Each structure stands twice: as structure tokens, then as C-alpha cells.
């Protein structure tokens, strides 16, 4: 297709896990959005959280976080201009961390063939204003009308 990943949803976490399991078993690059504790243990490596932890930029993010921790520890001993510069560095580091995390998430979602989520989870801010060429709702008759609209209204084109 070339227009980005498909969004595959279901009302329950169990149903989403069943979708994800089937996709993973046939070799589809699928990413599961949602809290990892609600995802079947055998599928947790396909969660966005797990993929973020494994991403090569995660080392850089951790390094910057460690720099911030070190700077914060030293703040009490700093005075005047040095303290102001340290605060500026901490603020800039937080911006860098946020940008790196956004880039990692965007790269992971862009590279997926299918993004899996519950119908309500499809409204998660992490998907932002992302558009999908196809939105699939498995077992749609089991979903309430309001929850079935969440993946359809803001994200499809």
C-alpha cells in the first residue's frame, strides 16, 4: 500500500492479543499499543513500550537522563551563573529527551505494517493525528457504538 500501517482494533485486550498473535505468527510487523500489563505475556515483545526499550536511541536517551541526574545532584553546590547554566542545561536535556522519544515512537509506528489497539486505546495521544489507510475493527458487534467510533472518526481517511 505504501500509505502507512493499518490500524487493527478490537473491544477487549484479549481480542486485540488474538489479532496480534495471528499477525506475528504469519510474520507481519505489528506493534501493540497499550499498557504492557494488559497484554498477554508471550506478546509483550511486540508492545510499543518493549520496542522503545530495545531501540538503539534508547542508550542515548538514558545517557542524557544520567547527565540530568548528575546536574541535579550538583545544583545545591553551584552558585550564581553556574547554577543558572546548569538549570538551562537540564531544561535543554529534557527537550532533547522528549524529541528523541518522539522520534523513536514515530519511527517504530511508521515502520509497522499493522498497529494493534483496543477501540478505546486507538484514541491514545501517542497516535497523535496519525492517519490510517485502513481501520479494521474485529468483533465490531461486541463494541459499543461510542467505542467503535474512536478508531474511525479521528484517524481514518
Regions found by a protein language model. Give the residues of each.
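SF2 helicase catalytic motif II
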Residues: 116, 130-148, 157
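Conserved P-loop NTPase motor core of helicases/translocases
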Residues: 2-9, 14-135
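Short glycine-dipeptide loop
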Residues: 2, 154-157
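GG-anchored amphipathic helix commonly corresponding to the ABC/SMC/Rad50 NBD signature/C-loop
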Residues: 120-124, 145-148, 152-154
